[in-house]
Amino acid sequence: MGASTGQVADSIEEMARDTVAFIRAMGYEKVHLLGLSLGGFVTQEILRIAPELIARVILAGTGPKGDRGIERVARITYYDMFRAFWTRRDPRYYLFFPESSEAKVLGQAFIARTNERVNRDEPIKISVLLAQLRAVRSWAKGEPQDFSEVNHRVWFVNGDNDRMLPSAGSYDLSDRLPNATLIIYEGAGHGAIFQRADLFARQATTFYLADK
């Protein structure tokens, strides 16, 4: 997203409208969505405002609107960015992965994979980060959404030790979605889908291709 141009939205609702506009501009009638973290908030809002565009949904490392535990994201982000600066590590090493030795090894492997290719993006601008944190804070303080009429197949995956977005929110949100399946990866954190990348890729492919 660092290479993107234009004005960055500072609300989940506006981000969702922008995403819907992009999907329609590309000429797609129906899409599968994978929403990770803040992207999961955006995906939930798209389910509400444009359900006709969506085939199946994967939500990963995210949480429901109105979960006040999500307000801690800014504090944790700043703290881990500070730790990363002093230890000369990628912030994701702290943000995405628990403190266990196995998780840290898998986290380092993920970061190494992302660094294999160069010139894919630009560093995220501070203005973008601040806009995202404002959007997250508003989401945490919002009214819970009603998904009782949403019949889309939804697969929810998270780790059991998500520092950024409380893992308990995964259970709450999956209960709100009538046709949702929740899988919790043991010993994984906010970056569960990266920590268990091979397993997630197989399961996600099976989910998206089911009934074809």
Please identify what each model-predicted range represents.
Residues 89-141, 145-146:
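Conserved alpha/beta-hydrolase catalytic His-Asp/Glu region
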